[in-house]
Amino acid sequence: MLYHLLYPLAADYKLFNVFKYLTFRSIYAMITALLLAFIVGPWVVRKLEALQARQVIRTDGPESHLKKQGTPTMGGVLILVCIVVPTLLWADLKNVFIWLTLLIIVGYGVLGFVDDYKKVVEKNPKGLSPRQKMFWQVLLAAGVGIFLFYLPGFSTELYLPFFKRVHPELGILFIPFVTLVIVGASNAVNLTDGLDGLAIGPVAINAGTYLLFCYIAGNARLSGYLQIPYVPGAGELAVLCGAMVGAGLGFLWYNSYPAEVFMGDVGSLSLGGALGTLAVLTKQEILLVIVGGVFVVEALSVIFQVGSYKYRGKRIFRMAPIHHHFELKGVAEPKIIVRFWIITIILALVAISTLKMR
C-alpha cells in the first residue's frame, strides 16, 4: 500500500525513491511487525484470557506441563496480524506471489482458528477431525499447485541444492509435490509447537533464511551468478519474509519460557504453510528439509513412533514428538528449546552455504 502510494512521488521527491528497494521495505516490514506485536500483544493476551481461551494440557504428558494449565492459547492470531498488515503496507500488491502466500497464511490460519475455537472455547476436546483438517489443507495447497502449474513462465522442475545442474522435470506431478511440501511443512511446525518458544524461534530463523533466497531468486544477475533458479517476482517475497521474522520475534517476547501465551493451531498451521509456500515459490523445496531440519525430525519422530507401535508393538521414543522424549529423560525445557534453536541456526548456515556449492 505504501509502495503504491509513495513510490510514484519519487519523481518529485527523491526521498521516496527508497521505496523501490526491497532491502528497505523488507527491513521496515520487519520493524513494523515487531512494533505491532509489542503494541497489540498485551491486548491480545488479555482478550484471550477474557474469552477463557486457555490451553488444555494432556495428563499423559510430562508432569512439568501441568503448571501450564490455563495459559491462554490462540495467540497465533497476533502472529497473523503482524504478518499480514506489514505485508499489505510495504509489499508490491500487484505481485501474485504475495497473494498466493497470504492465501495460505490466512486460509490455514482460519482452519487452525476454527480447530482451536472448538477445543478451548466450545470445550470440544476433539476440535476438527483429522480428516476435516487434512481435506482443507490439501485443497488450499493443491489450489496453489494448480495455479503455478498453469502460470506462464513458472518452472515445474525440481532443483537440488548441491547438484545445480540436475533439475528433473516433474510435469503434472508438480501439483501433488507442491501439495506435499505445503501440507507437510504446516503439520511439521504444528507438531513442533509443544514447548515454550520451541516452534516460533526456528520459524523466525527459517523466514530469515528464505528472505535471503527470495531476494536472490528474484534478481537475475545474482541468481545467475550463484546458479540458482531465477524466478521473476520472487524478490518481493523478501518483504513478507521480513514481516514473518518481525512477527516471530514479537511473538517470542510473550511465548518465551515461561510462556504468557501459546500460538495454537491458528499460528502453527499458518506459519508452516507459509514456509512451504515460500519454498515452492523460490524453487527451494529441498532446502526446506535442511533449514527446517528441526521440523522434519519432529515430524519423523511421530511417524516412526506410530509405525513402530502399530507394527512391532514397541515404542522407539519415550514419547513423541521427540522434544517430549528429551523432557522425560530429564533434560530441562529451556535447555531443549535453546538447543533446538542452536541446531536451527547451524542448519540455516548450512543452507546458505549451498549458494556457493556446485
Swiss-Prot record:
Keywords: Cell cycle, Cell division, Cell inner membrane, Cell membrane, Cell shape, Cell wall biogenesis/degradation, Magnesium, Membrane, Metal-binding, Peptidoglycan synthesis, Transferase, Transmembrane, Transmembrane helix
Cofactor(s) it depends on: Mg(2+)
Places the protein is found: Cell inner membrane
Gene Ontology CC, one term: plasma membrane
Pathway note: Cell wall biogenesis; peptidoglycan biosynthesis
Similarity field: Belongs to the glycosyltransferase 4 family. MraY subfamily.
NCBIfam families, alphabetized: mraY (TIGR00445)
Protein name: Phospho-N-acetylmuramoyl-pentapeptide-transferase
Organism of origin: Geobacter sp. (strain M21)
